[in-house]
Amino acid sequence: EMCIRDRGYTYEVDEDGDYRMVFDVEGDRTQMVYVRSSVEDFGTHNIREIWSPAYIAKTKQFPVAVANRLLEDSQDAKMGGWVKQDTTAMFVVKIDADASADQLSDAIDAAIRTADAMELELTKKDEF
């Protein structure tokens, strides 16, 4: 939270305690991003996740073409990858829980740019 406040970001805290923000992106579009408040542990690593949604499937399963496109994009992404969260395609960047404000800002930027580009490609809309 300190890094988020230090940057002067406008945010809401959702029911899970996560930080929800909306940023302006190119082409008069906006993109939603969540900085998870919970920290995941793996061995000596403490990991914070940044999530940004791009697509909602009409059924529980993603269409094959969409799933394959998300996998291809995950390979190209410098930071993060696509995950399926229920019916939502979510771009997730994982960073050190003690990342600096600059590192957090870069991770947020990677998430919103990647998710917004995919949302535009798959849906031609700006719902997130």
What are these regions (language model features)?
Residues 122-128:
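Short, highly charged C-terminal tails/helix-capping segments
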Residues 30-32, 62, 96, 100:
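Poly-acidic low-complexity segments
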Residues 2-3:
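Short, small-residue-biased leader/transition segments that mark boundaries at the very start
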Residues 65-67, 108-110, 124:
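Short, charged/polar low-complexity linear motifs in solvent-exposed/disordered segments
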Residues 74-114, 119:
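A short, solvent-exposed beta-edge/loop patch
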Residues 7-57:
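Ser/Thr-rich, low-complexity intrinsically disordered terminal regions
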Residues 46-87:
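Short, internal acidic amphipathic alpha-helical interface segments
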